[in-house]
Amino acid sequence: TYDKVMEHAGKNQILIFTHSRKETAKTAKFLRDTAEARETLDVFLPSTGASRDVLREAAEEAKDANLRECLQYGFGIHHAGMTRADRELVEDLFAGKHIQVLVSTATLAWGVNLPAHTVIIKGTQIYNPEKSRWCELSPQDMLQMLGRAGRPQFDTIGEGIIITQHNELQYYLSLPVSYTHLTLPTIL
């Protein structure tokens, strides 16, 4: 995931979809820690001092401990378990281009118009409690998440990256891409 993020970091905003609340913080912290270890953290921080101040103040304001840990480094998290105030704070910071990378559950795929140039879907299986097993995401869910990339009113092109098991590759390659502004050059 880190290498895919680094291909776009500093150039475009990135929205990463994970499939659990816990995974949002885990992924954001992994990206932050990896960037720190590889001395690339500056790529994720806003270029202006004013924007860095906005993130520092937002981190102090946030209720969610994981969000506080990540915000000041240019990473955000978003899921339904956060307070409404924290979710709105993250949405505003991402819309204002203060946050470079936002890791979210599908809460941002439905009902919130928050586009990004690059969308990464980290994993394609979700746990279905009714079936008591892991199931592949539906084509509708996949397209809804990928539809956050390169929205016409915000960008001229978008990139969707799907990280999945090799045996599921053909399934995702066969999905109809109904968004003419979206390209899917990378599927892992």
Give the predicted meaning of each segment.
Residues 1-25:
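Conserved interdomain linker/interface between the two RecA-like ATPase lobes of SF2 helicase motors
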Residues 11-12, 72-73, 115-118, 155-160:
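Short glycine-/polar-rich loops that comprise or flank the Walker A/P-loop
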Residues 21-24, 82-83, 108-110, 125-127, ...:
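Conserved nucleotide-binding/hydrolysis micro-motifs of P-loop NTPases
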Residues 22-101, 134-140:
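Conserved C-terminal RecA-like helicase domain
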Residues 96-100, 106-148:
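Conserved RecA-like helicase motor core of SF1/SF2 enzymes
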Residues 138-173:
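Conserved segment of the helicase C-terminal RecA-like domain
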Residues 180-186:
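Conserved small/polar residues in nucleotide/adenosyl-binding loops
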